[in-house]
Amino acid sequence: MSAFFRHKSFFIINLQWNQEYLNMNIAIVGTGYVGLVTGTCFAETGAKVTCIDTDANKIEGLKKGIIPIYEPGLEEMVVRNVKAGRLHFTTSLEGVLDDVSIVFSAVGTPPNEDGSADLKYVLEVARTIGANMNQYLLVVTKSTVPVGTANKVKEVICHELEHRGLSIDFDVASNPEFLKEGNAISDFMTPDRVVVGVESERAKKLMSKLYRPFLLNNFRVIFMDIPSAEMTKYAANSMLATRISFMNDIANLCELVGADVNMVRSGIGSDTRIGRKFLYPGCGYGGSCFPKDVKALIKTAQENGYEMRVLKMVEAVNNDQKDILFQKLECYYHKDLVGRTIAVWGLAFKPETDDMREAPALVLIHSLLRAGCKVRVYDPAAMDEARRRVGDSIYYARDMYDALLDADALFMVTEWKEFRLPAWGVMKKTMKQAVIFDGRNIYDGKELAEQGIVYHCIGK
């Protein structure tokens, strides 16, 4: 049972008497991953939430319970809160500003070519607010943004109010998200911490009121200044990315000196100063956060006359690591790859999502195609996304075993649960050559050797 469902009754029981909280009206601008999860979870705790997006087709779909992203448990929660009248969807931000006290900006901040965050959508939301607000509002940035963005949002709103000849009080705040794709609902409802950056007592009181159910349940809500809150998200993701790249560097060295990275990981993870999380070597990280946020923090440092030397190497190690399985394949077949059939299990950057942004599988597939290989792929959730990104140059298998037909090797790239205990006998009969390159170290090499399967992994 997830942590969220263990605590679900808390929110329902305690909010029955908390009419003040039940009367809270908030708006969430952007119905992407962050916006939709945030809005739906706030509605689940009892607040009245309106989610806004400029994509009319997406909004109409959401009204019907059609979810544009893959996230376990989200569809059921959206449908439940729409039926309860707590969750609404619209294309008009202007139409809801008179009815809400807090507006969350959860729009995209895609990277520019130089690695900096593109703030055009964030600032467009600010312009719309300034051009249409008629009462006090707390404008909260939920998107991952560089330090100083809140000041830019404030300037844009002030400019629009001056253009209208109005003087209306408002506050800005930063409330970065720390959601993991595939576990977002539990992350939101039972958080390690909630970080809130404010610059006025009024804003702090309003955010405290919004997060009251979490405070009552003893979850940590940490208030700080806005620049520190903005920096916290980038620093957190960059630290996690650093741990991954460090362990990949250690794993590669282990192979050269005859050490076993799994034993090394156990040894250092037992040190309470280090801990066991994010110490797993593999074929590189991807997704919508780590690559983008590392680049953005490097760029922020450059803009302020400083060089993030560690993060530059974190990025370099990760880029190299995404090609590590292909290099092992080249070595095994002495670069004789033309015409060989290679199976790929796992396309999303991690399990329990269909997100393929910066996914290691994309790098591997393109390397295989350039080498003249035939590629057969399977992923429980990301097949449609793969078709959109890769097209018809690869074969999209019906299931995990169909991907293995006549394969000269298997790349295990994303550690979905269904890949962890395959039928080894079926694999051997289906593959032309029973060779596995395990990019997540999920298999037991001794067991595979007993099965007559050639096994290569990371770091030993």
Language model features: what each stretch is:
Residues Y21-K460:
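Structural/interface elements that position substrates and couple domains in central-metabolism enzymes
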Residues F4-F5, F10-F11, Y21:
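Aromatic (phenylalanine/tyrosine) cluster motif
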